[in-house]
């Protein structure tokens, strides 16, 4: 739960303002990007009370959904659950390196004319990105991807997720709050992050 006395930084407030404008636009996809410690989680948790639409919180993994559930004090589910996807487990054709999925039913967890907020989006591969956007559009909803470009790439991929290149709008948080500016390691961490 977020303390009501917390003050957002200028960038964080700007991100919220842009997301709220995005919700009124014809665009479907917004990407909020930021390094660890820039306040992505805080920004999302402070955005939620300002939303005047239904929303669904999700993430690619159970662990990420649990973390999101804790910092937003709200239910979060996996992307696959939201999309009603189950793994294809035909034992005669099972290939651990090439797992497929099938839709078990029409997705029930995507809000109509609402917002899907997906954390840890750097892990989303091209096919899953396309499916998410297609499904969200079919419900006349919008998607907000939240990610850190220095986090995990999509599984079996050597390139960044489409969340960095195919969203209608993108905003990047740059100011790091979690580390003290006097921390002697911070410049080294920033150099490593920029090295890509």
Please name every model-derived segment:
Residues 1-196:
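Conserved ATP-binding/catalytic motifs of P-loop helicase motor domains
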């Amino acid at each position: 739960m977020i303390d009501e006395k917390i003050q957002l930084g200028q960038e964080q407030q700007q991100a919220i303002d842009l997301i709220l404008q995005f919700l009124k636009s014809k665009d479907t996809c917004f990407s909020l990007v930021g390094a660890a410690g820039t306040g992505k989680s805080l920004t999302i948790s402070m955005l939620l009370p300002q939303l005047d639409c239904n929303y669904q919180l999700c993430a690619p993994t159970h662990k990420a959904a649990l973390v999101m559930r804790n910092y937003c004090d709200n239910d979060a589910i996996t992307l696959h659950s939201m999309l009603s996807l189950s793994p294809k487990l035909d034992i005669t054709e099972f290939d651990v390196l090439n797992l497929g999925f099938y839709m078990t039913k029409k997705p029930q967890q995507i809000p109509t004319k609402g917002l899907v907020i997906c954390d840890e989006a750097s892990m989303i591969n091209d096919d899953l990105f396309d499916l998410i956007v297609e499904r969200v559009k079919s419900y006349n909803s919008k998607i907000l991807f939240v990610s850190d470009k220095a986090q995990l790439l999509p599984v079996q991929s050597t390139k960044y997720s489409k969340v960095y290149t195919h969203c209608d709008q993108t905003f990047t948080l740059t100011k790091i709050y979690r580390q003290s500016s006097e921390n002697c390691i911070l410049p080294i961490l920033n150099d490593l992050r920029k090295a890509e």
